[in-house]
Amino acid sequence: MTNMRKTHPLMKIVNNAFIDLPAPSNISSWWNFGSLLGICLILQILTGLFLAMHYTSDTITAFSSVTHICRDVNYGWIIRYMHANGASMFFICLFMHVGRGLYYGSYIFLETWNIGVILLFMTMATAFMGYVLPWGQMSFWGATVITNLLSAIPYIGTNLVEWIWGGFSVDKATLTRFFAFHFILPFIIAAIAMVHLLFLHETGSNNPTGISSDTDKIPFHPYYTIKDTLGALLLILVLMLLVLFAPDLLGDPDNYTPANPLNTPPHIKPEWYFLFAYAILRSIPNKLGGVLALVLSILILVFMPLLHMSKQRSMMFRPISQCLFWILAADLLTLTWIGGQPVEHPYIIIGQLASIMYFLLILVLMPMASTIENNLLKW
């Protein structure tokens, strides 16, 4: 009798994805982040579900309901902080996952890569709307500033903003719809993540060398299940250290002040994981130009396969490209730092230089380095 996991219609799907899946024998810990993202998503959906049971999406009671969750609901404080810091862990894993894809040339799998970029956009949208829900000062003003950017779109901009707001300012209608979208989007993300996996399993995983590993595969279980379990334990360790020892480390103190449309905070800034894009937005003195640069800073990932000039897939054996990749990583850290600083000298010029450097590295320097490396191979 054949094994049930190989014949049962449902178990067969799980088996082919997580048990008998042929995986390259040499994938490193950089390949752990996919499963960690899955864990983050499940964690966010579960904690979010319990928060939604006690949250009220009304401008008058939203802030109080979050306070009530932390003070009066059994273990409400830990659920709330796991959800808030879980988002930070989610984005750390996302950035690592995308960085891995860039370094090892995983973007050559076009469908998988493009669905991944869609997932990134959707996760960013979900996180933004979630940040609005506690209805603190930074929630309100963050929502006002970011939604207002759409008014830069010619002709339809103003109508579009008022349509999203559901009125003439960020108010009850906005909060209610943001809660509705924030609730539904993670389930859509989960569905698209399944499609992401489906396309990945059509081709099989990439590996650090960037060379086909068809001749050297090992079963996913037990080798990578145990490896992913270690990654998951480390993820939970870091998350719980944050939650239990420094729950507000990555938050903004302004969000402990209830939203007040009559009082603007001195420095409006988003959560840390959006600061790099926010810095790029602020570095351009024109509104429409800034919005375009903001969108392009993420959308540029779609063009990575077109910008791939190297004869090798991975950066493993390309020292010049490696150097530029780590300069890009440092540049993103610089932009993240600048995004959290006030708009004054010297931060303005640093932000502008870092923004120029970001696009220059991706669009010009890295393709040039690839071409140079191709020519060096001929020697």
From Swiss-Prot:
Top-level taxonomy: Eukaryota, Metazoa, Chordata, Craniata, Vertebrata
Note accompanying the cofactor annotation: Binds 2 heme b groups non-covalently.
Protein's UniProt keywords contain Transit peptide: no
Topology in the lipid bilayer: Multi-pass membrane protein
GO cellular component: mitochondrial inner membrane; respiratory chain complex III
Top-rank lineage group of the source organism: Eukaryota
Described function: Component of the ubiquinol-cytochrome c reductase complex (complex III or cytochrome b-c1 complex) that is part of the mitochondrial respiratory chain. The b-c1 complex mediates electron transfer from ubiquinol to cytochrome c. Contributes to the generation of a proton gradient across the mitochondrial membrane that is then used for ATP synthesis.
BP terms from Gene Ontology: mitochondrial electron transport, ubiquinol to cytochrome c
Keyword set, alphabetical order: Electron transport, Heme, Iron, Membrane, Metal-binding, Mitochondrion, Mitochondrion inner membrane, Respiratory chain, Transmembrane, Transmembrane helix, Transport, Ubiquinone
Cofactor names: heme b
Extra information: Heme 1 (or BL or b562) is low-potential and absorbs at about 562 nm, and heme 2 (or BH or b566) is high-potential and absorbs at about 566 nm.
Name of protein: Cytochrome b
